[in-house]
Amino acid sequence: MGSDTLSCTFLTALIHAPDVDVAAVVTQPDRERGRRMQVLPGPVKELALMHCKPVFSPVKVNETEFLDTLRHLAPDVIVVMAYGQFLGKTLLALPRLGCVNLHVSILPRHRGAAPIQYAILHGDRETGVTAMMMDAGMDTGDILGVVRREIRPDDTTGTLALELVKQGAD
């Protein structure tokens, strides 16, 4: 589950991992984009379709109809990165091994949206990518691992985001 270009790096790593079967991809619905405001798919959907993966784009991820679809897929694990919707308890309980979130900060610092921007804004000396088991809270589950990276004076949100996602995907 993911919705932005950063999510694509993680999805690419999962698709190419020899011991992983990406059964489906969940992303946000197509929306108006660009200067002409055409309804277009997001980057995660485009990537998934390029790799012939089934794509689901529920307006509300916790609705019964979509939960039934997930039950039918019977995933071992659900991996989430920058998805943009809160996962309810029913959804979190569906995969056999749970849901794993990849978050671009060293949790618990900078939970929620815009963690890279907040790390720079607050003058943090380091940041990273945290892999965690998801629970009902916002970025509050058990931490599985952290990859750390120093924040350099010349870092921007863009450069830092690209490096963190690449490190996290490895």
Language model region names:
Residues 5, 42, 166-170:
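A structural signal for well-ordered alpha-helical segments within the folded catalytic domains
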Residues 30, 62-63, 135:
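Positions that flank functional sites
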